Amino acid sequence: MNMLALTIILPLIGFVLLAFSRGRWSENVSAIVGVGSVGLAALVTAFIGVDFFANGEQAYSQPLWTWMSVGDFNIGFNLVLDGLSLTMLSVVTGVGFLIHMYASWYMRGEEGYSRFFAYTNLFIASMVVLVLADNLLLMYLGWEGVGLCSYLLIGFYYTDPKNGAAAMKAFVVTRVGDVFLAFALFILYNELGTLNFREMVELAPAHFADGNNMLMWATLMLLGGAVGKSAQLPLQTWLADAMAGPTPVSALIHAATMVTAGVYLIPRTHGLFLMTPEVLHLVGIVGAVTLLLAGFAALVQTDIKRVLAYSTMSQIGYMFLALGVQAWDAAIFHLMTHAFFKALLFLASGSVILACHHEQNIFKMGGLRKSIPLVYLCFLVGGAALSALPLVTAGFFSKDEILAGAMANGHINLMVAGLVGAFMTSLYTFRMIFIVFHGKEQIHAHAVKGVTHSLPLIVLLILSTFVGALIVPPLQGVLPQTTELAHGSMLTLEITSGVVAVVGILLAAWLWLGKRTLVTSIANSAPGRLLGTWWYNAWGFDWLYDKVFVKPFLGIAWLLKRDPLNSMMNIPAVLSRFAGKGLLLSENGYLRWYVASMSIGAVVVLALLMVLR
């Protein structure tokens, strides 16, 4: 039990050593430190898991020190382990370790090799703090650490201005969500006097029994933080641009760390959301809308990583849908299985990119199944899991649990949205696979090999099959029991979702293996061009935000840069100067000018006196 802190300390040690090496170490030494620290953290997690199950899945807390103590405000740096945090910890360190191992191969020869692993080690440490925190403020520390590391890693190739812009965009958009989370923190402490998760859930029913609507505002702010970090509507615009970073970073962000943080936040504070059913229903609606919009956007992408990015957005949408219909176990189960097959797909896409000499446009590839058969197999299995192919994939079991939860709790509309999303998922996933690995070879791909390349792919491939679905998160007693669907209804739903997935795959095969001319004619038609452009640009959210927020902000910044307050303070001086110049012109030395001026002045004075009288 006392080993819990090591899951944070070990990656932190790796970060410190790599940071102070300042790139002087060889790639082998940097890889040993960077990969080894996360590997040791994963090993410690395994020991912790064995101990946890040996003690009857008894939750416990490990106080480390008092972080802050100001008057009645006391915040401890305390870690908590229960079934929920153990599941997340296993995903973060386990899948994170496999991604680090792959990255040691992928990043060979890249400038900043040790810097890369320094950032990823800090990323893992921050995520572990977020997962194990027993209070909202400590979670917020890890939350911000994850945001910082994502900025550093997305902009890893900082010499390219586009990468810097993508990193800044991710940083700014997620900061919007972080502000909402900070507001939630302030509201909850002001109302309950504590930020400890267990204490908040215990105190909330009595405190908010009189209909105080501050709890609704607090949960809305929590939802705002979650949608920012997990790239859900309306703060989803950063995720596709985050593909500017190295491919292992994409795998780390999408599978093991950042985007799962928002999903984790809601179950961790589930007691508060259960008291605000309207907000909880909104969580499900946000997820349903996001998964549909992301599915259509993925269908027209040409960049292999952007297809996977939108698929992540869609799958996180399924998790939000599950949370919204109170299918708590299903949401975490899908989070775990998604980590397996999404890490597999991203790492396999990295292999494709390197084999194709850093080409990412899927239409410039083709016929790669012969050149890189292992990667092709990984895409088939990972794509099948993403598409929830029946019985043989982990994704089928976890996604069906979500749809069953929606149906059992009476949210038929959300279940239908989930089925439509499942069809879209299988369609765009196998569109990508058929274009990249079948058809005419357009680029000479070289073979990719190496133990550190193949081993992580093989492990993730196995976990993406039904084997991964055998790992059941120990959530009993941590989250409320999910309403179960009757056996007959469950069987009908499984058959329906399976048929939907298979039909999507068959349609993709018909269109992109046999009828590409039909696809081209549809894409070149007027409606096709209109919808294609709209979906390709993610439904125009970037354009809208640019017009509504970015341009006005830049205009205000341009104005403030010129110090308008100081300019206003100069107005009296400018007026006095002009008045002085005018009076100076009247001093011309001509007597007739002075007589005329006096006469005019006298007439004006007399006129004023008469008017005023």
Predicted regions and their residues:
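Membrane-entry segments of alpha-helical transmembrane domains in multi-pass membrane proteins
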Residues: 1-9, 25-32, 73-91, 129-142, ...
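Transmembrane helix-loop-helix hairpins at membrane boundaries of multipass inner-membrane proteins
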Residues: 2-3, 21-118, 191-212, 237, ...
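N-terminal signal-anchor/start-transfer transmembrane helix
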Residues: 7-23, 97-98, 227, 291
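Hydrophobic transmembrane alpha-helices and their helix-loop junctions in integral membrane proteins
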Residues: 90, 94, 98-139, 148-452, ...
